[in-house]
Amino acid sequence: GSRILRHDPRSGETTDFRRYTNRTNGLAFSADGQLYGCQGGSRRIVRFNADGSTSLLEYRLDGHFHNHPNDLAIDEQGRIWFTDPYGRLPAPGPQLQGPLDHASVLRLERRVDRTWTIRRMTYDTTSPNGILVSQDQRTLYVAESDYGEDKRRELRAYPIREDGTLGPYTVLHTFGIDQRGVHRGVDGMCLDTEGNIIVCAGWERSGPGPMIYVFSPSGQVLETHPVPVDRPTNCTFGDADLRTLYVTTGEGHLFRVRNTGRQGWLLFPPP
């Protein structure tokens, strides 16, 4: 466990890229090909350097450790937007300082001297999960995935204002409760070239089950595709033409979906 794997679609071989990553979750490449990750075990965003080392970014918001970063998205200005829910597993060292009194979307951005600082961006989330920036950089998509019966599981769209702050969100889709229990809501997600949102959602214990959904930018459900195992966790397009969808699951699977009829959109494709 606690590894980052590298899959070669040409050979079909999957190998260790990094081991002992301290429960790293969401990953994203920057414009210069650097790989950044949400290191939940250390409650930090980190950069995985080519020489095998790891660089730590700023991890304090107003002097306090933030929570347990889950997923991240890097915009064309190089700012790192990340979701910061409360962790379900303890972090050994940083637990000496308790969590924040909120679970928000935060943003890492550079100061003039190139050091990092953190800003709080949302004040209306309780368990933010997957996150994306739209192609035109004007919308932030956030999965609010709080599992309580009286909580919200929504796919949200926040307008990104000219000054970089977020406007009031629009709910694109709500995941409710059925006779079997609470829907899991959205986990990870990605975009296609038409701006549609491909999301991993659901589980076997309630609702229509584990599923890949395709939403239009306005929230219309364009497609649903059942997943044969429980808890799809994240997805991205890959291969040379970005027409193959790769899906991970909480059970440790990696699925490859060909002939999707879609082409993925990545602001910064892997080097």
Give the ranges of each region predicted by the language model.
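Sequence-structural signature of mature extracellular/luminal beta-sheet repeat domains
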Residues: 1-271
